[in-house]
Amino acid sequence: MKPYQRQFIEFALNKQVLKFGEFTLKSGRKSPYFFNAGLFNTGRDLALLGRFYAEALVDSGIEFDLLFGPAYKGIPIATTTAVALAEHHDKDLPYCFNRKEAKDHGEGGCLVGSALQGRVMLVDDVITAGTAIRESMEIIQAHGATLAGVLISLDRQERGRGEISAIQEVERDYGCKVISIITLKDLIAYLEEKPDMAEHLAAVRAYREEFGV
């Protein structure tokens, strides 16, 4: 685990974005941890979040021309990541996002920001069922652009309804790499360093045994 990944876990714990305990997911599964990126909700939170996303992008080595944030949660992520890349990595890249409903007046269309072209890096909070990615792919392809990759905050590394995860489905269906700031494996490595969190470590390991990919 790299220093920025450990710092991100601590940031998420601090903001109660990441919690350990017993939680029922939308799928009905009982999970020993819960991640709610919506709780990164202040100016400072967003500034820090952008730095973590930018760090993960630079670390990945994936080449891309533009950041795309799917409405709605991807919008502030794309914005703050673009700022962080420019301020901390000297990479001044364009970004854009979609509207849920296309405007029929003013500038019109369903996109806001830069022209959607070239190699697109899609940024979002998490991938649950992959629906937002599929909707975004239709927009990206309609504009003649290509998907360079997807970056999310957390990869739960667990099976969907079948034998593979929603993330593996996206990689298979679109031939692109999905990267994340942290993974379930990183969470376990972090818990292993914390003797006072041993009960959570046992629960997360058991969960990975049952649902992991």
Swiss-Prot record:
**Source species of the chain:** Salmonella agona (strain SL483)
Q: Per the record, GO CC terms? A: cytoplasm
* Residue numbers binding orotate: 34-35, 128, 156
Main enzyme class? transferase
Give the pathway listed in the UniProt entry for this protein: Pyrimidine metabolism; UMP biosynthesis via de novo pathway; UMP from orotate: step 1/2
Positions the record marks as coiled coil are none
InterPro entries the record matches: OPRT, Or_phspho_trans_dom, PRibTrfase_dom, PRTase-like
Which named protein is this? Answer: Orotate phosphoribosyltransferase
